[in-house]
Amino acid sequence: REEKFLAKGLSNIKSTLEEGVSRRIFTTERVTEILGKISPTTDLSRLVNCQLIIEAVFEDLNVKNGLFRHISSIVPEDTILASNTSSFSISELARAVSHPERFLGLHFFFHAAKNRLVEIVKGDKTSEQVFDNMMQFMQRIGKDPIVCKDAHGFVVNRFFVPWLNEAVRIYEEGIADIAAIETAACRTFGCSMGPFALMNATGIPIAYHAQKTLYEVYGAFYKPADKLLQQMNSKSPWEIKPEQIIDWDVYLQVSERLSAVTMLVCGQILDKNICTAGDITRGAGIGLKWRKTPVNIFNRLGQDRVIELVQPLLQKWDMTIPRKMDTNSWIPDYISVEKQDNVGVLTFNRPEGLNAINPMVIDQLEKG
């Protein structure tokens, strides 16, 4: 059975590369070269000479722990080990790793071969050298890394998965049908795929289990929608009808609900210093391909309107408003300043906008 999985994996890789040839991203020779560097195997002992090993098995804590214990017993103590988990604590997983200072989280995004975003997550015992090496390595292979604290859901999934779940709740409550929710979501966040299309593409079980993990850690607000569980159990995709003309009142309800949930969760992220507002923008812009990120929406609506939008959620789920729902906390860090001897170095960090200059960048340049 394992050999079939290897064959399927290689076939998927080959299809992606051939698509790259058709789009003139790769030459046929380059594809042959890449495929020649891939050595599929079910024999873990062949990992003994690897310098970096990234685990990407399904989200089962016992399976991951067992795998890391096995790998730790095979490879040298300086081999860097990483998990692609999107649900579990890196510090918890590190308990299964000998020499946990060499362990960290490297969370890639769908489609990993095309998506530039990667979340880099330090565990309690991750060494600075391992962290720095992985930052440099990710940049060298063309990724745009964001750094986040070790918290369930990290950055992007912490707000993206509740966005999916809230879309199902809206459908469940009869406020709008799936087609209308898709239309409103795409217009509000500037994305090409709405929540239901994305769940169909990446797997409804993945959305459900990710939301369930958040619920178990963070409480009632994160409870998976009943229809999400039902749809997963049906083993069928969501039925999405063609885009339709949407009633304006319905559009506003859907848009405001999805915006409120997203900004509330991002406020919680900022409260815990899991990342910066700039990292949220980079995560949404690069990882999710949202042209209108939560930070963009917050700054467009303004602090008072955002607080007004999240009030119904706070009342319904008996929550307090995050402390960092103020304008200053939602300014993305586009410019970093560093002094090297007598030279000042300004670094642009706005890859989601191709490092283009906008009024906020100009303001930060002047202050820098």
Regions found by a protein language model. Name each.
Residues 1-342, 349-352:
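N-terminal glycine-rich phosphate-binding loop for ADP-containing cofactors
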Residues 357-368:
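A short, well-ordered alpha-helical element
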